[in-house]
């Protein structure tokens, strides 16, 4: 590895940004907005998520191309991080009836969070040798889940009983805590992780060239089919990541409606998931470096198929916790190995551009399709059948993944030689 300290500082950003995804998207703000601010109108929360993800999906490919041309990935990451942090902190002022303010702040914060991931992921090929992509990517996701556990423990201590007259105030204060956590632990990356010096000379504006490159890449991938393995992988990733995002989004709803679990039980469930996700990220990261990310992803997708079948059959809280253990092992490893496989497939000096399609057009847009599909099945039948139906996405994604050809690499080949 080039520098263990730089890798550690890079993984700290994963540690930092999970404060937003856990507190705002998954556990606290989502319920606060739906039940308290919007008066139980859950569709408004779904609309907010969909709008933010669509915008982030459309922005990510051109932003990635611009970052490659301008060689300012860190600057772009800083800008989007600050947008997310500031808007998250301002959510403290969202109170009952402030629906428009709550929607706008969340959309901006989530765009900042999601768009920033394009530039964060694009650092990976510059940090380590190609043979270590799986392990380092796994470290990042493991740190993310450790961060999630840390911020959940802080919030559990911060929040009083739900019957307390100050409960709503401390819920709002938790948004400020999430913002501060995100900001503080992201600082080391900006101070200590440098970008490689590249010699591209620009005669046109970076924005113009970036947009042109983004258009050419889209045509190269899906019209001229110059990168068939990347095209197939992106399609497979779209499908199985869609399923993963949907399961995350509806896990608490499934638990409360099917098993009548309390909020406290649901929080403990997420603690279990995050804990096993840490182990899964480390274990499968090491496995990935030995057998390759494609085979490792295949293993995790098979586990996911067992998870959705388990959710369909589960009858009590204990069984649901066991399903959560399996999901936790798979969730971090599926995503970390996908990131390392994308890094292996991506042409050198075009990392941010291609990660723009990976994280953006295919990663973020999948957050729109899956939840809608789940909701329709749940309304037509029930939550159990909806969970089982999500297995279709895993199965088809698994089949397409097998057609992805992974390039061979030599053990002595370093990232410096690649890029």
Residues covered by each model-derived region:
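A membrane-interface helix-boundary motif in multi-pass transporters
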Residues: 158-180, 376-394
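Juxtamembrane intracellular "pre-TM" segments in multi-pass secondary transporters
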Residues: 1-7, 194-235, 419
């Amino acid at each position: 590895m080039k520098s263990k300290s730089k890798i550690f500082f890079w993984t700290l950003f994963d540690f930092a940004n999970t404060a937003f995804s856990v507190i705002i998207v998954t556990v606290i703000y989502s319920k606060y907005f739906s039940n308290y601010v919007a008066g139980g109108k859950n569709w408004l929360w779904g609309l907010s998520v969909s709008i933010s993800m669509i915008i982030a999906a459309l922005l990510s490919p051109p932003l990635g191309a611009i970052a490659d041309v301008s060689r300012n990935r860190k600057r772009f990451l800083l800008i989007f991080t600050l947008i997310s942090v500031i808007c998250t902190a301002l959510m403290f002022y969202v109170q009952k009836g402030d629906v428009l303010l709550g929607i706008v702040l969340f959309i901006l914060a989530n765009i900042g969070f999601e768009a920033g991931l394009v530039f964060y992921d694009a650092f990976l090929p510059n940090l380590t040798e190609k043979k270590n992509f799986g392990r380092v990517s796994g470290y990042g996701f493991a740190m993310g889940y450790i961060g999630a556990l840390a911020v959940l423990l802080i919030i559990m201590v911060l929040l009083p009983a739900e019957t307390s007259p100050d409960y709503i105030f401390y819920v709002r204060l938790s948004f400020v805590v999430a913002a501060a956590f995100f900001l503080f632990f992201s600082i080391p990356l900006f101070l200590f992780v440098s970008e490689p010096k590249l010699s591209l000379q620009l005669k046109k504006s970076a924005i113009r060239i970036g947009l042109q490159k983004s258009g050419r890449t889209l045509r190269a991938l899906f019209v001229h089919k110059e990168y068939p393995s990347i095209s197939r992988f992106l399609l497979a990733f779209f499908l199985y990541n869609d399923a993963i995002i949907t399961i995350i989004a509806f896990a608490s709803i499934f638990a409360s409606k099917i098993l009548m679990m309390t909020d406290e039980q649901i929080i403990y469930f997420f603690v279990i998931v995050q804990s096993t996700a840490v182990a899964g990220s480390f274990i499968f990261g090491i496995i990935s470096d030995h057998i390759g990310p494609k085979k490792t992803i295949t293993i995790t997708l098979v586990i996911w198929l067992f998870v959705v079948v388990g959710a369909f059959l589960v009858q009590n809280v204990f069984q649901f916790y066991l399903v959560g253990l399996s999901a936790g092992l798979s969730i971090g490893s599926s995503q970390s190995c996908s990131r390392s496989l994308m890094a292996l497939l991506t042409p050198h000096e075009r990392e941010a551009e291609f990660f723009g399609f990976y994280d953006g057009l295919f990663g973020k847009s999948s957050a729109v399709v899956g939840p809608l599909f789940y909701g329709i099945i749940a309304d037509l039948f029930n939550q159990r059948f909806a969970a089982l139906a999500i297995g279709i996405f895993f199965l088809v994604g698994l089949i397409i993944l097998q057609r992805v050809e992974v390039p061979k690499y030599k053990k002595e080949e370093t990232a410096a030689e690649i890029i």
